[in-house]
């Protein structure tokens, strides 16, 4: 039987690798998805772990010097649906299925959604940084 401490030890090792590798938008998005999805695979509860997962998953994004990925409240159901679809497709963690992030290609829908949510923030930051004509 797998216990949370053992799984979290594996998660921390994977997180540290992806944290170090997050240097641009593409690698930061992949680090975000890997950290977030694997965390909720270990802790699939409706007790606030989604908020914790999103906060922790944004650490590599921030480390790369980028603004955080924010799930808009109106997209929350889509976000939860995609997480559950992934979990349903790859199965729960067990002795036979202990990989934290199996079949990453199954994250394509969530990747597309996260990228679209993030693009809004990236555009706001770019707009704030652009020079303005003073009237």
Residue ranges and their predicted role:
Residues 1-135:
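FIC/Doc superfamily catalytic core
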């Amino acid at each position: 039987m797998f216990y949370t401490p053992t799984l979290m030890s594996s998660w921390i090792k994977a997180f540290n690798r992806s944290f170090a590798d997050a240097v641009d938008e593409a690698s930061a998005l992949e680090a975000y998805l890997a950290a977030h999805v694997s965390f909720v695979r270990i802790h699939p509860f409706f007790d606030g772990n989604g908020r914790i997962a999103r906060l922790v998953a944004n650490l590599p994004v921030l480390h790369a010097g980028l603004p955080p990925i924010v799930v808009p409240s109106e997209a929350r159901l889509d976000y939860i649906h995609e997480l559950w679809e992934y979990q349903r497709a790859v199965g729960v963690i067990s002795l036979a299925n202990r990989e934290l992030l199996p079949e990453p290609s199954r994250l394509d829908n969530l990747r597309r959604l996260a990228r679209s949510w993030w693009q809004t923030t990236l555009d706001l930051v770019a707009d704030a940084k652009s020079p303005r004509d003073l009237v």
